[in-house]
């Protein structure tokens, strides 16, 4: 029997995002100043022209992603759950869901196990917030 190497879900996201970018040139990635933490750096290093760093501007992250979807791109936006959807929920509701744009929202660091980041980075309400938005599909991966 072979022992499977365990990886974090954010590592799985980074590898999956990179694979999606290889398979489809319309895939773009956006980050709100947490590129390495969410592992979007794997995509950014391979496809720098298809990566946008919006800085600490989570509301703008959602609006830019929605605009890119309107012109035919497939945006994957990444941040910690406390910031997206925690900080930009209204933009997600209005610019992404209301307009029914094809935006993928990937949030890491949900729950209370945020390590040294502490209470200011804990998010317990992310799934509840997203589930009430019409046309929103929510996945919560457990293993990679």
Each model region followed by its residue ranges:
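Thiamine diphosphate
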Residues: 1-144
């Amino acid at each position: 029997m072979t022992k499977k190497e365990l990886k974090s879900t954010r590592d799985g996201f980074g590898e999956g995002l990179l694979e999606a970018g290889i398979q489809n040139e319309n895939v773009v990635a956006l980050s709100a100043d947490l590129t390495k933490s969410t592992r979007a750096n794997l995509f950014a290093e391979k496809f720098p022209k298809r990566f946008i760093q919006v800085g600490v501007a989570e509301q703008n992250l959602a609006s830019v992603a929605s605009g890119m979807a309107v012109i035919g791109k497939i945006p994957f936006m990444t941040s910690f759950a406390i910031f997206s959807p925690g900080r930009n929920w209204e933009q997600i509701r209005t610019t992404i869901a209301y307009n029914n744009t094809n935006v993928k929202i990937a949030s890491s660091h949900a729950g209370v196990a945020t390590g040294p980041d502490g209470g200011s980075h804990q998010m317990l309400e992310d799934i509840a917030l997203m589930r009430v938005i019409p046309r929103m599909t929510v996945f919560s991966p457990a293993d990679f």
